[in-house]
């Protein structure tokens, strides 16, 4: 007597699959990024190939191209994520939490130490620093007027240039020191100098 075989099909919902997929994607992107910056320590940017990254990261070329069109797209994606993190942090900037926001910026830099150390070593790509300057100018002006209600547009521009370039230089020195100093100590010192000085005029 023949018995019918019962086929049992286990269905997984998209919601169940998504976390695993996201973890795989994050792992793959991390491997690509790590390998990319390892190669940047060995050779110039324009000498790195997708093939080298894939061989060293032990991934297929199709996997790389699933996420990035080429090496330039990879770098732009890394920079864009970095800028997005900075933008989100600056968006939180208010008088009551100013020091905490700046400490958060230092943390973002440390979390992206591979990118930041590369920029310190080889210089940022054209327009990168300027884009940060321009992108945050207007909203920073609105927020800083909470500190200094009587400030004029021209005075704000002087202050912004001084503060922006000063913080960039301090962060650069922090990177060169291999992140030894505590960010909260640096922030407390620099902000007290800036704002105690500015308050003499406003």
Regions found by a protein language model. Give the residues of each.
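Alpha-helical bundle regulatory/interaction domains
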Residues: 1-43, 47-202
